Amino acid sequence: MVFLHAIEGLMSIIIMVSLGYILTGKGWFTPESSKLLPRLVTYISLPTYMIWNLLHTFSKDAFVTLFAGIVVPVLSMLISFMISFLLSNMLSLAPNRKGTFRSAFFCSSSLFVGVPVNLALFGENSTPYVLIYFLANAFLFWTIGNYSISLDGKTAPAKLISIDTIKRVFSPPFMGFTLAVILILLEIPLPDFVMSTCKYLGNMTTPLSMLFIGIAIYGVKLSTIKFNKDVIAVLVGRFVISPIAVLVVASFFPIPELMKKVFVIQVALPAMTQTTILAKVYEADTEYAAVLVTITTLFAIVAIPIYMTFI
């Protein structure tokens, strides 16, 4: 029954992704017009959704208790990174692929994909836990992940902590989260019309995100996907090692059951889409990064129902 519930929860997501794929094939979305969707999600729908959901869900005391759970994703992701570091050297990967491999191994698309997937599986009560994981994921990706990918490229390596890193961490969704937290801690309510506006705009998040994933999948040639040792290692890292790391770390902390389930689903999501962007920026192996993002996206559709059955 749990497996079937997970399948049912994912069916709407699969349909929306398929719609994005089909419409792209019919010419509705071009490379230029498709750029609008992630911009709408990143700058409009996700920030407003965070403001509405957090203010709608949490009191001051409840939020302080919630935030203590961030230690679980931080520790589990650091464990996954250390394992990816060892594996990338043991597998003798090409120098321009090691950092990309590590980032795809330990960082997931915890917001762009995480919000709609967890909403489908657990409902609105899961969103605060999704955001907690997102904070840890965003900080570690834009510091350790960004630095690792920069070592792959021909350009000068990025600094582990820099002004640019801070700007990327403080993205519009993060700022929406921060504003909501400030309002919660100061116990300042927003007018009903503002909350309603945030809710309506925030409801665009899931369909726009899923349409864009369909567009992205259409743009990747399946002939470029080869199941070599490092691709298999990334799949094992994303869908076996990282979820196990979360479960092990979570067993040492008294966190709510729903929080644990959300963290497991969050870590079993596709690699960050920004992995491909950074590979291009640093002149690393962009095609390799695109393949890892695509193949982890496809495998996540299979992995998520399985984890829903056992957690």
Regions found by a protein language model. Give the residues of each.
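Alpha-helical transmembrane segments of multi-pass small-molecule/ion transporters
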Residues: 1-311
